[in-house]
A protein has these predicted regions:
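N-terminal accessory/interface modules of nucleic-acid-binding and processing proteins
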Residues: 1-257
């Protein structure tokens, strides 16, 4: 590992050591996660550590490609991410949309958005996919889905998680209370991440107590397990929402033609 890789490795460790230390740090990380859900949890940690306000990140070559036809502004600093799928980890770089400029031929960037027009379609699509009824309120439906998926995730990874609670605050709990803490921390964190994309001030919908269990994840292994779970579930949900909005737009376009 060269000096630059050691620096960024240290930055990642430092960030992981802080993100569950208080509510502000954790919710700040969740906001970054909500805007960058296409990335893995370790990549989201690196984005948060370097550019917590980043909203839409792509590699240099992608910005120049046909889909975006944008240029990266001179002097922009890339966000370093570790690539771990080789024998030896190495760094790659992405740039936030704020680092780019438009050309005359650049298409308009339109991030997906839940609107009054597509909200009902999104709720119906989420009910079809996850089997959780909407009852007219998307946010409540998403909270119920988050809870259901947190329970599924626990069932799938229970053994692995119980093996890593040593030296964390969770170590003092029996198995049942570890399960309760895990499901609570994951479900509330996923719900907050969802709210970040649907309401202007997600903090108005949550209390400090909603994240109390997060503080029990206070070792690197338990923080990583929590972050990985929140990433997996929220990404799955965001992808379904994005898909539903795309389908709705196609339906409306067909009706207009």
């Amino acid at each position: 590992m060269n000096a630059k890789e050691r620096f960024y490795s240290g930055l990642a460790k430092e960030t992981i050591g802080k993100i569950t230390s208080n509510t502000d740090n954790w919710t700040s990380f969740l906001r970054t996660m909500s805007r960058n859900y296409e990335f893995t949890y370790p990549e989201q940690v690196m984005i948060y550590a370097q550019r917590p306000n980043a909203t839409f990140c792509k590699p240099y070559e992608d910005w120049n490609a046909e889909n975006y036809r944008r240029y990266v502004k001179r002097g922009s600093t890339g966000i370093a991410l570790f690539v771990m799928n080789r024998d030896k980890p190495y760094l790659r770089y992405v740039f936030d949309v704020a680092d780019t400029g438009v050309r005359r031929s650049s298409p308009e960037l339109k991030p997906w958005e839940v609107t009054p027009e597509n909200r009902s379609y999104v709720m119906e699509a989420m009910e079809r996919t996850f089997g959780v009824a909407a009852d007219g309120v998307l946010e409540a439906q998403l909270e119920d889905i988050a809870s259901a998926l947190a329970a599924e995730y626990w069932d799938d990874y229970k053994k692995q998680f119980l093996d890593i609670v040593a030296n964390s605050f969770l170590e003092e709990y029996d198995e049942l209370n570890i399960e309760v803490a895990f499901k609570n921390a994951v479900a509330n964190s996923v719900s907050y991440t969802m709210y970040c994309r649907f309401v202007e001030s997600p903090d108005n919908y949550f209390e400090h107590e909603d994240f109390q269990k997060v503080f029990d994840f206070n070792t690197r292994q338990t923080v990583n397990a929590l972050g990985t779970a929140v990433n997996a579930i929220s990404t799955r949900m965001f992808q379904e929402i994005e898909k539903a909005i795309g389908e709705h737009e196609q339906i409306k376009a067909t009706e207009r033609s």
